[in-house]
């Protein structure tokens, strides 16, 4: 089951989230918005298992990577039973 994976512009390009992901959902892409000149990207969200290891690995104060599990998303939209 895929989950929503959002990357925010607070990403510092450290690659911690990419290395933490057991299913290779994340990768780094070029970006001029930070010192590292790269930012995390999530091109394979269909492979996300929702473990949130990427969130745990993120060293920024405001998590740059956020995973929304399917059941959390439907509940927040009032679609859960």
UniProtKB/Swiss-Prot annotation:
Binding-site residues, [4Fe-4S] cluster 2: 21, 48, 51, 54
Cofactor note: Binds 2 [4Fe-4S] clusters. Cluster 2 is most probably the spectroscopically characterized electron acceptor FA and cluster 1 is most probably FB.
Catalytically driven reaction(s): reduced [plastocyanin] + hnu + oxidized [2Fe-2S]-[ferredoxin] = oxidized [plastocyanin] + reduced [2Fe-2S]-[ferredoxin]
Binding-site list for [4Fe-4S] cluster 1: 11, 14, 17, 58
Subcellular location: Plastid, Chloroplast thylakoid membrane
Cofactor: [4Fe-4S] cluster
Subunit structure, interactors included: The eukaryotic PSI reaction center is composed of at least 11 subunits.
Protein name (record): Photosystem I iron-sulfur center
